[in-house]
């Protein structure tokens, strides 16, 4: 995965673009954002669980856009994860 290209593409449509990473099996409790969140997985994997019951699995190269107010939780895969994200314009 070309991380620099993915970040450049995200910067064209979002602001406050930043990267983050987590270790294997880390968990994010259910929460929501007041903005549209655009996220690209650049390494590893993560599973997002949406409040409506859907599950979205992301691996390197996959992208997810969460509209404002979308309640979600997440569980990192067995190899950890690294993502870049931003607030979509």
Residue ranges and their predicted role:
Residues 27-33, 49-50, 56, 75-76:
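Short histidine-centered beta-strand/loop micro-motifs
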Residues 16-33, 68:
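Conserved short histidine dyad/triad with adjacent acidic residue
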Residues 32-48:
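Short, conserved beta-strand element in jelly-roll/cupin
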Residues 24, 34, 54, 70-71, ...:
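A generic "binding-loop/recognition-motif" signal
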Residues 24-25, 43-46, 53:
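Short, charged/polar surface micro-motifs in flexible loops or helix N-caps
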Residues 52-68:
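Short acidic-glycine-tyrosine-enriched beta hairpin
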Residues 68-89:
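Ligand-binding loop in jelly-roll beta-barrel domains
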């Amino acid at each position: 995965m070309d991380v620099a290209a993915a970040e450049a593409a995200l910067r064209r449509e979002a602001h406050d673009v930043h990267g983050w990473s987590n270790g294997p099996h880390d968990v994010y409790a259910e929460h929501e954002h007041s903005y549209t969140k655009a996220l690209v997985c650049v390494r590893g994997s993560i599973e997002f669980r949406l409040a409506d019951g859907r599950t979205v699995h992301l691996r390197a190269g996959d992208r997810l856009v969460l509209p404002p107010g979308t309640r979600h939780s997440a569980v990192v895969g067995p190899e950890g994860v690294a993502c870049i994200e931003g607030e979509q314009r």
